[in-house]
Amino acid sequence: MLWKSLIALCVIGAAVAEQTPVFLWGANSVAKPSLKTVSQVEFAEQLAALLEDHMVVAFEENGLSSKDFLCSNSQAQSCYAQLQGVSPKTYYTSVENPSEALRSVAAKREHNSIDASGKLTTPAKCAVGTALFVTFEDAAESREASLESHDAAIAAISKQFECKVAYLYLAAPSTAPVVQRRTRRDTAATTGGIMWKSTNQFQIFYTALLYNGNPITVTDLKLTNSSSTKLSVVMDTSVADKPITFDVVYNGGYFSLSNLVYDNNNFRSSGVNAPTTFSYSCGNLTLESAAVNNMYNTLSFKSLQLQAPFDGTYKEDFPFGDSWDCVGFVTPGILMGLFVVALLLVIMFVGVCWMMDINTMDRFDDPKGKTITINAAAE
């Protein structure tokens, strides 16, 4: 039984050990026969010698195999056009756990990643004896396009180091986490409508603008900085001398609309506000003016979204922040539902209490006892 257990452990150990290709360049190294697997210990000794006078940068490619080095693009050119021209270089067909071998001999280890633009997310400093592990962000593209973009990124990053550097291109360990990043997107669709922008200070989007149910056409937007906490916006319309004017005021981390005027009517806009890092969003915003002779005017925005960051670090054409919706968390429908549920609970509680108050009779007719006789006498 003991020797069977030892054989099983050896088989499991051989299965767990990862044997992947490694491409090394930037330093002289000993070539190995292509049919021979370089053990982890042997490869670690070779890397330890390199770390004495080199910095080692390891680019870890997810799922790298020998077939990837035969990759070609749509123009029948190699996906590794940049790596083909480096020297000196050595290709190892099979190396046992190359990443672990580097980790075991590197006293100083750093980790970094390459973003979608092909640049390091954190600037790296050149230091002899340091092992830098670089991963790639996953992108929704073909394997050929991914390898080709990684090849260009590796070539660009290799030129940034001024000290002696040995580079490794190897497979990422199967247990290594996959780097994923969320791309910021607009929280509301900005297609099929009208967008007005003023540098990096203010932008507004809507699909329709109505005054008492009649459409309004905006021809231009002008913005004036009244102060560091107040913007004055003028939206010229197709009707002469009838612009839409309003102020955007910053207070306590929020921006809000005030003094909205159109056609000499002042509309109530006290509820139009949001944090500066968010965008105010409303599917159907209808503003009303003060009633005159029991009549009032309405100004409606369909699919409205606007934002005033009050932050100079924003770029022009900045994307809208997360949506700050005009509909409150507790809507009338939710309130009605809660009221109905509470009413049903009260009815159920009262009914259960009544059922618990039902008492049985404390006296019963005994069939073995004396018969109860009731004489019915006529009076």
UniProtKB/Swiss-Prot annotation:
It is a single-pass type I membrane protein. It is found in: Endoplasmic reticulum membrane. Its main location: endoplasmic reticulum. The chain crosses the membrane at residues 334-354. GO terms for biological process: regulation of cellular pH; vacuolar proton-transporting V-type ATPase complex assembly. GO terms for molecular function: ATPase activator activity. GO terms for cellular component: endoplasmic reticulum membrane; proton-transporting V-type ATPase complex; vacuolar proton-transporting V-type ATPase complex. Glycans are attached at residues 225, 284. Residues 1-17 form the signal peptide. Disulfide bonds join 282-326. Residues 355-379 are cytoplasmic. It comes from the Eukaryota. It holds the Pfam family Ac45-VOA1_TM. PANTHER family: V-TYPE PROTON ATPASE SUBUNIT S1, VACUOLAR ATP SYNTHASE SUBUNIT S1. Accessory component of the multisubunit proton-transporting vacuolar (V)-ATPase protein pump. May interact with ATP6AP2. Accessory subunit of the proton-transporting vacuolar (V)-ATPase protein pump, which is required for luminal acidification of secretory vesicles. This is V-type proton ATPase subunit S1. It comes from Drosophila melanogaster. The lineage of its organism: Eukaryota, Metazoa, Ecdysozoa, Arthropoda, Hexapoda.
